[in-house]
Amino acid sequence: MSFIVPEEIEGYAEAHTTPPAELLAELAEETKATLDSPQMLTGKIEGRLLEQLVHALQAKRVLELGTFSGYSSLSMAAGLPEGGHIDTCEVSEKHSEVARRYHARSPYGDRITIHMGPALETIERLGGEWDFVFIDADKENYANYYEALLPRLAATGLMAIDNTLWSGRVLDESDDEETTRVIRELNDRIVADERAIAVQLTVRDGVTLIRRR
């Protein structure tokens, strides 16, 4: 599914991206067939992007907000260095059940921990700094997640926030739907934040990468 770029460009990019492992392809099919809102699946291109970022950073401590069916956590796990670990937060038992099954079948099952419950509570409980953070949970809390985690990025750490173009709806100032407004306000906050350096990418539904100054 393409959210921003034309379908034919998305298809070309997918065709020139290293294909996902068979287990990820199987997970994608099950997600589309059995779960509500399958468009929430990270997908081939963004999954590889996350893996590349984790690998390039040699990120040992990774935090994900929003496990969904486990595609993104498995993608990132493939880029972990020796001793690296992913903590991922989820509130849906149905989603986490799928993720746990596929994590267990992968080579990375012992390197991913799913934490059930509100992400802000998990963030506070886990403590410490993070080498890489991927935010893809409830949009209404995006600003809270950003504020909680920006100070806790490692000196060379990176934060990735998903869906920051929101199918292009952020462009329409007359669109006052709550999620659209929340994302638009967050985008404005990030670019004006003197603590951060950000780039917004037109990958999938928009991915914003942020580091601390």
Residue ranges with predicted function:
Residues 1-132, 139-160, 164-213:
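A short alpha-helical cap/connector motif
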